[in-house]
């Protein structure tokens, strides 16, 4: 059998590629080695599917590390607004949430998955599930896809959309890198990204902070000389292995690259629990809160600022009793506490492995 386009991989990219090819008149085959299409899409965004982002192209590209500029040509053909129109034309209403993120109004990724699957059927895309590609033989005009039992499928165009090596339970095992290399692409070193950070700090190993969430904080990776590498602002979660949550996940690739670049075993990340406030302003606010309720303990009057367990942890770090009242509160201790809130440091030694990451860094070179 000969096709105009064969798409290998039934994830988000594969579904979009197959739909687009068929919509433009190509006889299209979609091959998926698993028993279900859209498996990774169904779990994206916490099962809600973060479809796209409404921020301007330049702002989106500025947030992409490395050579983000390569997306300008792609965005000139199909950008975030085109994605929104694509889904809304198919009846999927979207809504905007924080940081420009777009989700289906249904709050269910299955809405997006089922819509794409229906579109595959309407566009006449042929589907082969439970079918593993064993090899690809590239020709000048026609390429051969080798399937189990030495079955051969011929195509004028092959789209490799099999994903990286992250979230292997969805079928992403890195099959495509060898095929891309054979086609002439340069493959760069793989690394985990969008992945929790790990730490051997005593308070991490002893699970003192496990389960504590910090909302809307800034986390910065520091060079060995103390200068900042990158800052991300969002939520954090302390775990039994280190730090997770959106801000830590976004920072992870910078930590991975810096550990390798500086050839060190550990880096410091610094957490600012009050990023909109200068340190002196925070000191003044802490004093004001204590002064307004002079007979209450600082544990009570400062409680709105931080989760209680984290508040008590910081007080213990600076050797300040949680029961101290304003009358016995030393200014130097307020200064120390404010400094901890603005510059809480955690030594990190890496990340969880690539199979625990949401995204694979590296791969096909874009240069």
Q: Where do the protein language model's features map onto the residues?
A:
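Glycine-rich FAD pyrophosphate-binding loop
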Residues: 6, 22-46
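Glycine-rich active-site loop/strand segments that organize a redox cofactor
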Residues: 48-96
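An anion/pyrophosphate-binding glycine-rich loop and adjacent beta-alpha core
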Residues: 35-37, 42-43, 51, 57-58, ...
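Feature captures the FAD/FMN-dependent oxidoreductase FAD-binding
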Residues: 77-157
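A glycine-rich dinucleotide-binding beta-alpha-beta segment and adjacent secondary-structure elements
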Residues: 129-130, 135, 312-367
